[in-house]
Each structure stands twice: as C-alpha cells, then as structure tokens.
C-alpha cells in the first residue's frame, strides 16, 4: 500500500490541476461501430451497432457481418464502380473540396463536409459527439439514459429530465454503472429539479454478481418526473452508465420469478409471483422446502416470511436446529419512510435496539430516535420529544445503566462537527445535555466510544480516534469520567497507532481490551488511504498493541464480538488511486478475527437474493445474533440483516467443538463433557488454546519493515525487534555496532522522531513543542534534539527551565541571567500549562516530597496598582489569578504559590523561596499555522494560495483535501473547487444562458426583447423557485417554493430549463432565422455578440456595455475582457500604459510623452523583440547624452526589418518630455540601416552641457532585431595627453618601487637585529667555568710553583662536537712582552687560541674535570648535528 499512499498525492495534483484542455480529452475506446469508410460511401452506410449491446458482443457481431458480406460485395462492386465514375465525371471538383470526418459521428451528430468535424446536437460534445455535456429532456414512456460510448469525459456535468404524467410511478433500472467511487456521482431526484426529494446518489462500480444473489439496483420515482444529474471531476474516468426507465414496469421485472400484470384494483402493474416466492418484486423466498412439513414447521401463506418453525427449528425453511449447528442469514424489510439512514449508531438494552441519529436525504419525516423490538421484530412508537435534538450523523453511542451517551458527530444542518455530550434516558425517553467541568477534548466525527469499568472502580467512556476539522485525524484516546463529569486526553503507551475516520471497534470483556479495525486515515497531509490495521487497546494499562492486519481495506464498516471472535461486515472498500481495479464502494464482505489465535478468516457473504452491499450501517449483538440495520449503497437502506451464528452447545463431541467456526471460538470442558463458548472458558483453557495457536501461527515478517519507530516495532504480534533506526524480524540479527531491542519497555521514551510524523495537521503538530510543521511538504517533523540545551524545555518559541534552589528574587534573576535568560513571563496558555504540569511532576517525585515549590516568576510591581511581566507585558489576571486577598501591599515580586489552582501571590523580594522559572528565546522560529480549512467561510479564502483546502459549492463548506471523503461520504458535495477557482455564490451570478444551464439548480428567464438577454434564477422545469431566506435551524429545513411570478409568460418572458433560446445575442442584436445575430450593435462582435470590438473592452454578455480602451495614446488595442492595454511602445507598461519599465533602464513620462531607453556612449546595444509578449510592439525610443563636449557624436542603427527613423535633439532630457521643444535632425522611412555624425560645434556641446539626442524607431513589424550605438572618439592622437599619461604612469610605478624597496630594507634590518640578538642570547647561555692560570715570571722563584703545573700545559677548554669525533681545543697563549715582562701599553699579554682537533682516537676521559667542577657546571642542552658548543 505504499504505492497506493504515494499515488494519492498524484491524484490530488491531478484534481487541483484540472484545466479546460483536460476536460476536453476523450475517454477510452468506444463501441459505436460504423463500417462506412472514405472512398466507399455505398457499402454498409449507416450500419451501426446499438449502445444497448454489451461491449464484448459488438466486435463479434461486426465480425459476423463481415464474414457474411462477400456475396453482397460482389453484387455491389459494379454498381459502386459506375456510381463512383459518374460522380467523378459530374462533380469531381466538388468531391475534391469535401472533407469527411476521420471518425464517425455518434449520438445524432453529423459530419460537416467543409471542416471535416462533427456537428453535435444539443447535449453532446466531443470529437465524435461521444460525451454528454448538457441537458436532455426525455418524454417517452420508456427509454434509456447514458453518458455516451466509451469512458465519460473529465470534469463534466450532464442532466436528464424524464417527464411523465403527474404522480405516475417511474422505475429506473441501472443495467450498468461504473464511476469513480466517492468522487463522481449520479444524483436522482423524484421531481423536476434538484430541489425535489433526493432518492439516490450513485457512485462506484455497480455490476450484477455472477452468483445471482444480488439484484440490479432500481430506483422508484412517484412524482411523474425524475431528474438525473451527473458530475465527474478531473482525476480519472470509467465506462459510465446505462440506465433504462419505464412508467409501466414491475419492480425488478419481478426478479424473473413471476409475471408482470395489470392490477385488478388500479391501472398500475404488479407482479404475480411464482410458487415459493413472495414480495413486491418476487424476491423473498416463501416456504422453502415446504418448511420441512410436518417435522420442522408449517407454511403460512398469509405471512410474508412464510415458514412458522416449530420450537426446535429455525432459519430458512426451518432447516437449522435449535441450538444452531451452523450459521445463517435472514433479512427483514420495512417500507417506513422514516427508517432509511446511514452513519447512525445503535445499542441494545434488553430486547430493544435503540437507533439514534444518522444521515438522511430528506428531513421532512426524520426521527432522531428509533426503537426496534428484537423479539417481535417490530418498530415501536416513541414520543415526539425524542426528536428535540439536532440531527447529526457520524457520532458515537455508549450504553450504561439505562442511559445512552451520545458524543460528537456532524450537525447535518450546518456541516459543523460538535463536541456535545448528550444523555438519552430510556425510561422517560428524554435528552439531557451534559456540561463537563473540564473540556480537554476534541470535536470529532467518525469515531467510536465504549463505557468500561476500570480495575480501580472508575467508570469512564473511552472515545477512540475520529476526524476533527481543526486538528485533522485524531490518534488520541479521549476519556470521559462519568462520576467526575470531566474530560481528559490519555497519554497512552505501547505502539504509536494512526487514528482515522470510520473504523470499527469492539470491547471484549474477557481480555478487557478494545479491538479497533480499519478506517480512513491520512498518513501525511497529502497522502491518505483506507487501512486494514487491527489494534488492541488495554483499557487498564492504556497500552496499544498492533495485531495482524486483515489485508482487506475498508472504512464505515461494523464489528461485533461473538464468543471470542470479532465479526466484521460490509464497508467501503474502494482503494483505487489512478485507475479502477474493481474495488467497490459498497461491500458485503464478511470476516472473522480469532482473538485467541490472532488470525483472520473470510466468511461466506449473505445469500439473500438481494443487494446487501453497504457501508455506514450499524451492527449490534443480542443473544449471539448480529443485527445489521440500514446503511448506504447509493440508496439509503432500512432493512435489517440478521446473522445467527452457530452455537457451541450444539456440538456434542470434542472434535466437533474444537472444529467449530470460523466465526465462533468454542472450548471443550472435559469436566462436564460440554462444548462451551470462549466467554465461559477458564484461564487454564485459555492459555492452552493460545499455546496451541502459538505453535501453529505463521509470522508475517514482511510487516516488520513497515514500523518506523521502536514502540510499534516491539509492541506487535509479528515478532519484530528494533535495531537502532529500523525494524527487522526476530530471526534477523542487527548489524555490528547496533543495539537490539525486543521489549517495548527498553525503547527510548519520548522520542519526537517517532511520533511527530503521526500528526496530520498543522494545529495538531503545533500542540507538541518538540514538533514543527513543514508547510511545503505538508508534514510534521521533529525539531533537532536539545534545541534548548540540557535541562531546558522547548515551549512554543521559548525555552523554559524550572530550578529548585532556595533564593531570593534578585539571586534567582541573576541565575537566569547567567544562562542568558530572564525570569519567565507566563503570558501564553502553553507556558502556563507546561509549568503547572512540570511542578506537579517534580512535587510528586520522592526527592522533592518534603519540599514545597513556590517558584519565582518574572512578575513585578511597577507602581501602586500596576504589575507587569519581565517582557514588559501587563498582567491580565486571566491565565493565572491572584489568590484571595492578593496582591498584598507587602510584596513587590510574584511567586506561583498554588500551582494546582493557578494561584499567584505577592512576596517580599528579599525573602528566599524554593524554586524559580527561567525563560529564554529558542533558536528557532515556530511557523504559524494557516487558518484551518473548516474556519474559512468563503470560497476565495478557502482556495487562495494553496491546494490544502477544497470548496464545496452547494454545501458552502471548506474542507481539508485529505478529508474530502470523510466530510462527504454520501455524495453530499455536488461540485468542488480548488486553487483560486470559485463559482458565483448563486444563480444570479451567471450572465449567459449557457453558463446558467451548466448549473443543475438554475434556469434562464429571457426578457421580452428576444435578443438573448435575461437573468439566471434558481428554478425547476416548471419555473423559477424562491429560495428560503431562513437557514436550517435544528430539525427545521425550509424548502424552496415554485414562484412563477419571477418569470411571467404573460409579460412575454420565457423560461428555459433544458435548452437555451435559439437567439443568443446578449441583447445587442435581433436574430434572423431565429438563431443568427443579424448585426451586433453597441460596439460588440462575435457569433453571439459576446465580445467587444477591437479598441474597446468590457463584458457585453447579457446586455453589458463596452467602453474604449484607456491607453494614454500608447496602444489602440486592449484585452476585450479586462481592458488591459497592449502597449505598442517598448518600455511602456501598465494596464493603461501609464508607467515606464524603470527596472530595465527606461525612463520618461508616458502620461505626457513616452518612455526612452538610456544608451551609454561607446557601447553597442542589441534589442531582440521576438517573444510572444513583444507581439504588439511597433516602436521603441532611445535617448543619448554626449560625454565629451569637445568631440563629435557618431551613431549607427540597423535592424532585421524595415523601420521608420526620427532623430531630434533638445537642450535637456526633462525638456524632451514636453511636446514642441524637440528640434528635428533626421527623418527617414522604410530603411534598414542608418549612420550619422553630430558635430560638437554645430550643436554647440559646450554651451549645452545637457544636450540630449532622441531616437524614435517606429512602424516595424514583429519579430525584429535592432542594433544601435553612440560613440565619441578623436581622429588623431593627442601627443601631449599621451606623454602626460605615460610619464604619470612611469613616475607612479617608480615611486611605488622605491616605497617597496624601502619597506624591504626596513624588514631586512629588523630581521638582522633580531637574529643578532638571538645569537647574543645563545652565546650568553653557553656553559662556563673558572680555571686557575699560573703565569711564570723570571723574578718568581721556582719553588713557589705548584707541582701540578710542572707537567705539559693543558687546554683551558675542550668543546666536543656532535658524535665526539672532533672538538674545539682552547688554550692560553702568552703574547710577547716588553721589558720587565709587562705587555706594551694598550695590548694584552694573554690571548685565547682555539683549534679544531680530532679526538676520535683518544679516550673519552683524556680530559677530565674535577668532581666538584662537574657538579657546579650548568646543564647544557644537547647540541645539534655539527654544532660546537
């Protein structure tokens, strides 16, 4: 069904994109065969197969004729050849000019030899006149109604009036009918207009069944007239219909079981039935098998039911024992006109079935409440007071202690969905309207309700799903507490189910669970379809579980519980999207679901010799018997279908007991050796049965991948488990790194990614602060996680945080500011409800049980009597209220003192209190929802801007596109509109007869002038009707009344209802030959004087006037309807050519002159006027101003076609807009190219600095390409200017180079200084030590020198290089000295000498420092390779 769901979006696009071109497309193949072909006019001329032949037989009949025709061909060929030769000789030229239609014309159409096209009679359209497209009047005593051969046309409306004698019974028999279910309808009225009583609304596929157990539908009209109106939309079309009618026909032709004879008591005909058949149409079996006389029963010939069974027998022909060992169907038929209805509800109290509400075609004899005695099988009389409640349908009923609770539903008179809760007291037959204390509820239609007693003793009514016009399809469970008189919306757990409209639900007392099946659901705003889902809702744990689906999609069906089995009957099963696959609107499918085994079974359909297909019916259970009442199958039904299931106690053996069903679940009681029902089984027997079913069950693993959330994946019976982001069967393992979840309890809670996409409307999406509506795709998406941060909560457009710290007002405010927030301003309902809810949760937690939270909020006292919030909005005392005797004068700051009562208190700001509420703006903007469709009361508001809404013109209602079928399930909407297309509100808005008669409720009143002028009025075939001024109120529906005074024939007015008068000149001409307008006057033209002549505009239809086009001299033509001018000058725009295209460089004043394109000097411009929008342009204007005052101005222009050229000049451009101030320069005609030069001396450019040249190009034809350029340049090189420019550039470059060189030098010097500084720092950081030096002098005695220096002098330093293979050896060198051993003045006596020495062959300890020196030496860093330290 994914493809079906996706196709619904395409279906909606096809509907909203319907155009006139689409409406003109013909349908599929037709079967009106014509053997006549071009070139052989004599053979088989006029040979056609009639429409009444079924399509499969027509090709066969044609083939038979062709096989039998060779002898006839041989006889006719010579005659044909002679006739052809004579025709060629006499009128060869005329034959050459005549054209024959490519395909034969049908339905009375004739081929026009001049055009080769079919000319259709009134009411037929199409290339072959094969589609109906107007009104027909049928007066024969019998005949047929058809839409034409082949498929009917898209977006079409056809109307047939069958006229007979007053109060004569007419029968319409639907031999074939196939239209798009729920969208394309054929309406049948018992009268001469749509204001007569509606008796049927046909839609879908209505084909006689091969089994013969269903009869062809038949409609009866008793007024002597019948009006049939057909409407199809733009989605897809089917084969249409073939309907026969007769005024002298017995019901259903006596069903083939009798003879139609004239009644002895009247002139009418009636059936004389064969033996064993009774009823008006001989369709009721009578005394089958002679009722088993004498053993089982006797035949009662006076009773329609026939058999009177003995006490031990029952069923048809008394063939089933008591208790029943097999199930069977029976049918009870009633003719009371107050009974037929659909979408009603029924409950059983004692032996009485109470039926409440429902939809009816006509409300003249409507009864809100009906009572049916199941024992006597008779309808009981009730007080008229039971009808004091407004008529509604699609509501719910629930019975509790002789009281019937009715909730919701759609009010038929207004089309609004209500949230009323009313109670019907059975004992006194009276209604009471309840006013609940808390109204947290949805107004829904198409829902269900059950009253259950919970394990905690509370008695509640549970309302399941439904459709709400404001919030879309509801997936919530609403709970009404009967004792507290309060509503609440439950927060359920388990699977995330999808709510819908028109589902069925039953309550099983044994499992204490609700079982919900099917429905019409929206899976996003643009995707909607029927469903086959089955959900289980545990009423005590509030847990949803997804059970095995039925594979049969349906809605508006019914279900009951019989001995552990849910029986499902009927419903609308149409689920086709782009073409028909045979799914019917009305079904008689009968299915059973075994609760213990989670298994579906298909049961035999009722074999009752009647059409029992239906939807919108009710079903109740009484004494193991199901009673199905009413419903809709194009007609509203009033019969009762009775299904008696087999009884468990009828089986005497264990094998037969366990084999009972399907349709019932029986259990064998070994103790008593009896077969008992599922309801009486013990817990052990139940577990045993479930274990047996578990071992035999077949799992549908393909269903696992349909679950997109962890909750639904783990809360179903398909044995699935969750792997991070997808659902897989249990026998499939998760990928590496993924976490497998098998139990619902282990799923992450409150993940918005799971539940946001279940919301189908913007309003329902906006209720959850974690979701956001995406208007482009019309879907609800989850906001990013932690959009507010940890500990913060998104509420609307704000982030809220509740703290529990005990602080005074200023400290609480400071805490909020530290988080970029303020104390909360609780000014919206969302904020208040969130804070109160969170406070209740926090207060109930164990950690906070001893702490009372009275949090600070952002409310302060500004002056003596004025309080305002932190966001400076005033306090209104509405969402939150002051507690009694508050606010006190002692406090200046607000606290939420009593959250349970929304009570505020003024507190002293310096007192520390528990808690505070902080608020900061969210970093996303919540998108505002548009006005819901249901609140748009005008067509313009409904259809403007988007395709999300649809406007129903006759109901004056706007509905969601995904809820059209749910809003009009019985064809109430006769025509709908979308995407800014709206019809007039009533008939008076149509100005022509043809448009008037397209509307089924309108007629045309022609005035005495007989020129086609008149007015469109609501009316019937007999004349105009006066519509009621009062809207329907309660159960009062005012009816239109015939009022011939609105179009009196005595005053020479003429009323037209079927066809328009022949003369249709819209009041602007008389007619010759009754239909040809003689001469259109009043500035009009056209075949019917329906348009204005060229140069004038207006709506001349029905006497309207034409007025001249107002184009300010820039156009002579305009749109004849709107008056928008077709401006002839390029650059001039506006409806009246009053503006210039400033955005495209055009300037000027078209009100006093024209518009010019501003040209730049020394540029070439090309204008290509080749688009369709350029068709009307014949002129274009340019303006150019010289840039240089000392140079001449050159120009050239060429074009692809001839044109006229005028060049003028003026002292300034502003003067150029005024006539008479431009001086002509050039005037040329019929040229393609022109060049010229304007001397700066001649035109004195120096004294006219604003001189402007105007170029007028005109009188060209579309399309054209124009090139134009103005330029100024010298004929010789200005050397002075060249050298000045050259040297200026050279010096500039030189200066730039010098500056760059200086900058480079500065950077180099700076880097050198930094490098030297680093070297000095590195040298300063080198290791150092002290050394003792003994300097010998000649005067010193040798004995003073220590022994350590007697050896060879040693170096003062040895600095090894990297690798220890080389070193720098440093020694002291004594320099030459003077006398006395003293160096010369200014010189040193010592010097340090260093040399690079090889130490690779030496021991590493050749030079060893003393241990003390080593300890005092600084640690040096490791040297780089090749670096000496």
Swiss-Prot record:
Kelch repeats: 352-402, 404-451, 461-508, 513-564, 566-624, 625-671
Residue ranges constituting the CUB domain according to the UniProt record: 132-248
Expressing tissues: Isoform 2 is detected in plasma (at protein level). Expressed and secreted by activated T-lymphocytes. Expressed at low to moderate levels in peripheral blood leukocytes, spleen, lymph node, tonsil, bone marrow and fetal liver. At very low levels found in thymus. Isoform 2 is the major isoform in peripheral blood leukocytes.
Keywords linked to the UniProt accession: Cell membrane, Disulfide bond, EGF-like domain, Glycoprotein, Inflammatory response, Kelch repeat, Laminin EGF-like domain, Lectin, Membrane, Receptor, Repeat, Secreted, Signal, Transmembrane, Transmembrane helix
Segments passing through the bilayer: 1280-1300
One annotated Gene Ontology cellular component of this protein: Golgi apparatus
Propeptide residue interval(s): 29-83
Expression induction: Activation of peripheral blood leukocytes with phytohemagglutinin induces strong expression of the membrane isoform followed by the release of the secreted isoform.
Signal sequence annotation: 1-28
Cytoplasmic-side positions: 1301-1429
Domain spans labelled C-type lectin: 795-919
Post-translational modification: Heavily glycosylated.
Domain (EGF-like): residue spans on this chain: 101-129
SS bond partners: 101-111, 105-118, 120-129, 250-260, 254-271, 273-282, 816-918, 1063-1071, 1065-1077, 1080-1089, 1092-1106, 1127-1137, 1140-1155
UniProt keyword Cell membrane present: yes
Entry superkingdom: Eukaryota
Annotated PSI domain residues: 703-748, 755-794, 932-983, 986-1061
Topological region Extracellular: 84-1279
Name used for this protein in its record: Attractin
Originating organism: Homo sapiens (Human)
Lineage: Eukaryota, Metazoa, Chordata, Craniata, Vertebrata
């Amino acid at each position: 069904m994914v493809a079906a769901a996706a196709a619904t979006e395409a279906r909606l696009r096809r509907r909203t994109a319907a155009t006139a071109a689409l409406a003109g497309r013909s349908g599929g193949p037709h079967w009106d065969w014509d053997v006549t072909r071009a070139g052989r006019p004599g053979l088989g001329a006029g040979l056609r197969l009639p429409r009444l032949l079924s399509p499969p037989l027509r090709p066969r009949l044609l083939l038979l004729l062709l096989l039998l025709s060779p002898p006839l061909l041989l006889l006719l060929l010579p005659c044909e050849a002679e006739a052809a030769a004579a025709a060629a000789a006499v009128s060869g030229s005329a034959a050459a000019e005549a054209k024959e239609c490519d395909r034969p014309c049908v339905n009375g159409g004739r081929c026009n030899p001049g055009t080769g096209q079919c000319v259709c009679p009134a009411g037929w359209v199409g290339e072959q006149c094969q589609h109906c497209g107007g009104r027909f009047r049928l007066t024969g005593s019998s005949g047929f109604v058809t839409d034409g051969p082949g498929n009917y046309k898209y977006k079409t409306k056809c109307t047939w009036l069958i006229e007979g004698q007053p109060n004569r019974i007419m029968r319409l028999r639907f031999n074939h009918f196939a239209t798009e279910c729920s969208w394309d309808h054929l309406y049948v009225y018992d009268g001469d207009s749509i204001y007569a009583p509606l008796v049927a609304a046909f839609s879908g596929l209505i084909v006689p069944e091969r089994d013969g157990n269903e009869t062809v539908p038949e409609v009866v009209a008793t007024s002597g007239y019948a009006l049939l109106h057909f409407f199809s939309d733009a989605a897809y079309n089917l084969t249409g219909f073939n309907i026969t009618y007769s005024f002298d026909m017995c019901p259903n032709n006596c069903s083939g079981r009798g003879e139609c004879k004239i009644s002895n008591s009247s002139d009418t005909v009636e059936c004389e039935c064969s033996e064993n058949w009774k009823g008006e149409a001989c369709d009721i079996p009578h005394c089958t098998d002679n009722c088993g006389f004498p053993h089982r029963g006797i035949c009662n010939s006076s009773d329609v039911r026939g058999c009177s069974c003995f006490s031990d027998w029952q069923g048809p022909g008394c063939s089933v024992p008591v208790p029943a060992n097999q199930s069977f169907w029976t049918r009870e038929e009633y003719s009371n006109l107050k009974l037929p209805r659909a979408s009603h509800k029924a409950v059983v109290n004692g032996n009485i079935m109470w039926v409440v509400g429902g939809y009816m075609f006509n409300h003249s004899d409507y009864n809100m409440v009906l009572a049916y005695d199941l024992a006597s099988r008779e309808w009981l009389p009730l007080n008229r007071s039971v009808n004091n409640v407004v008529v509604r349908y699609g509501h719910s009923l629930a019975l509790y202690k002789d009281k019937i609770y009715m909730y919701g539903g759609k009010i038929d008179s207004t089309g609004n969905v209500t949230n009323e809760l009313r109670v019907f007291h059975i004992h006194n037959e009276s209604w009471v309207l309840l006013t609940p204390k808390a109204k947290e509820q949805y107004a829904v239609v198409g829902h269900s309700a059950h009253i259950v007693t919970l394990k905690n003793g509370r008695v509640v009514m549970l309302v399941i799903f439904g459709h709400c016009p404001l919030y879309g399809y509801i997936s919530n469970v609403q709970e009404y507490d009967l004792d507290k008189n309060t509503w609440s919306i439950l927060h359920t757990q388990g699977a995330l189910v999808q709510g819908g409209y028109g589902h069925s639900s039953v309550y099983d007392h044994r499992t204490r669970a609700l079982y919900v099946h099917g429905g019409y659901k929206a899976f996003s705003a643009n995707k909607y379809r029927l469903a086959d889902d089955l959900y289980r809702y545990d009423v005590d744990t509030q847990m949803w579980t997804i059970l095995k689906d039925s594979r049969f999609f349906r809605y508006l069906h019914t279900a009951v519980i019989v001995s552990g089995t849910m029986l499902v009957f009927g419903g609308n099963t149409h689920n086709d999207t782009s073409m028909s696959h045979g799914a019917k609107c009305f079904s008689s499918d009968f299915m059973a679901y075994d609760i213990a085994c989670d298994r579906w079974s298909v049961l035999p359909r009722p074999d009752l010799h009647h059409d029992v297909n239906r939807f919108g019916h009710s079903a109740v259970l009484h004494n193991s018997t199901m009673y199905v009442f009413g419903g809709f199958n194009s007609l509203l039904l009033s019969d009762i279908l009775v299904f008696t299931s087999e009884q468990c106690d009828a089986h005497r053996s264990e094998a037969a007991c366990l084999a009972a069903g399907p349709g019932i679940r029986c259990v064998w009681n070994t103790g008593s050796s009896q077969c008992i029902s599922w309801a009486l089984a013990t817990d052990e027997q139940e577990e045993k049965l479930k274990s047996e079913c578990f071992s035999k069950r077949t799992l549908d693993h393909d269903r696992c991948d349909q679950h997109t959330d962890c909750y639904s994946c783990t809360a179903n019976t398909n044995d699935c488990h969750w792997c991070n982001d997808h659902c897989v069967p249990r026998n499939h393992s998760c990928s590496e790194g993924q976490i497998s979840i098998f139990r619902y309890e282990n799923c992450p809670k409150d993940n918005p990614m799971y539940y946001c996409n279940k919301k189908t409307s913007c309003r329902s999406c906006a209720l959850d602060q974690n979701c956001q509506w995406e208007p482009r795709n019309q879907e609800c998406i989850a906001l990013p996680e932690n959009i507010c941060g940890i500990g913060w909560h998104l509420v609307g457009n704000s982030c809220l945080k509740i703290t529990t710290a005990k602080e005074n007002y200023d400290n609480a405010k400071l805490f909020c500011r530290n988080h970029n927030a303020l104390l909360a301003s609780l000014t919206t309902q969302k904020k208040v409800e969130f804070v109160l809810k969170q406070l209740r949760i926090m207060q109930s937690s164990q950690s906070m049980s001893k702490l009372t939270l009275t949090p600070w909020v952002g409310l302060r006292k500004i002056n003596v009597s004025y309080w305002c919030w932190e966001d400076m909005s005033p306090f209104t005392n509405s969402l939150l209220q002051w507690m009694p005797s508050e606010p006190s004068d002692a406090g200046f700051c607000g606290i939420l003192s009593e959250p349970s009562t929304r009570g505020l208190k003024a507190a002293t700001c310096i007192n520390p209190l528990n808690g505070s509420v902080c608020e900061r703006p969210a970093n996303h903007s919540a998108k505002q929802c548009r006005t819901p469709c249901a609140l748009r009361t005008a067509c313009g508001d409904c259809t403007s801007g988007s395709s999300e809404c649809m406007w129903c013109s006759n109901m004056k209602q706007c509905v969601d596109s995904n809820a059209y079928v749910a809003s009009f399930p019985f064809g109430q909407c006769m025509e709908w509109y979308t995407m800014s297309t709206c019809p007039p509100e009533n008939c008076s808005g149509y100005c022509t007869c043809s448009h008037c008669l397209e509307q089924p409720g309108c007629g045309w009143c022609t005035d005495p002038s007989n020129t086609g002028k008149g007015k469109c009025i609501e009316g019937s075939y007999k004349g105009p009707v006066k519509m009621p001024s009062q809207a329907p109120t309660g159960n009062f529906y005012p009816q239109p009344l015939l009022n011939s005074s609105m179009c009196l024939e005595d005053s020479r007015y003429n009323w037209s209802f079927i066809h328009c008068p022949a003369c249709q000149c819209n009041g602007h001409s008389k007619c010759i030959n009754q239909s040809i307008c003689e001469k259109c006057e009043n500035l009009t033209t056209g075949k019917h004087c329906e348009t204005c002549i060229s140069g004038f505009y207006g709506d001349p239809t029905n006497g309207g006037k034409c007025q001249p086009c107002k184009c300010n001299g820039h156009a002579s033509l305009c749109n004849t309807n709107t008056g928008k001018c077709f401006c002839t000058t390029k650059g001039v725009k506006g409806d009246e050519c009053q503006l210039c295209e400033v955005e495209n460089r055009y300037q000027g004043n078209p009100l006093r002159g024209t518009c010019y394109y501003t040209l730049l000097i020394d540029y070439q411009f090309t204008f290509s006027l080749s688009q369709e929008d350029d068709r009307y342009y014949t002129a274009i204007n340019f303006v150019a101003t010289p840039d240089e005052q000392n140079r001449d101005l050159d120009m050239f222009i060429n074009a692809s076609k001839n044109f006229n050229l005028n060049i003028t000049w003026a002292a300034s451009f502003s003067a150029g807009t005024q006539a008479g101030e431009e001086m002509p320069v050039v005037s040329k005609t019929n040229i393609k190219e022109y060049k010229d030069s304007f001397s700066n001396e001649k035109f004195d450019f120096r004294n006219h600095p604003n001189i402007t040249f105007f170029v007028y190009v005109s009188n060209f034809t579309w399309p054209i390409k124009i090139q134009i350029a103005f330029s100024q340049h010298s004929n010789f090189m200005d050397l002075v200017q060249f050298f000045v420019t050259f040297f200026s550039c050279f010096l500039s470059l030189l200066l730039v180079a010098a500056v760059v060189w200086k900058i480079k030098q500065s950077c180099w010097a700076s880097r050198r200084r930094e490098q030297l500084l680093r070297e000095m720092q590195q040298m300063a950081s080198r290791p150092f030590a002290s050394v003792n030096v003994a300097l010998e002098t000649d005067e010193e005695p040798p004995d003073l020198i220590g022994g350590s220096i007697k050896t060879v002098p040693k170096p003062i330093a040895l600095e090894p290089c990297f690798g220890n293979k080389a070193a720098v050896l440093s020694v002291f060198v004594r320099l030459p000295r003077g006398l006395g051993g003293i160096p010369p003045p200014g010189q040193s006596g010592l010097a340090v000498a260093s040399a690079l020495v090889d130490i690779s062959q030496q021991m590493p300890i050749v030079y060893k420092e003393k241990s003390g020196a080593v300890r005092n030496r600084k640690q040096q860093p490791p040297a780089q390779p090749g670096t000496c330290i």
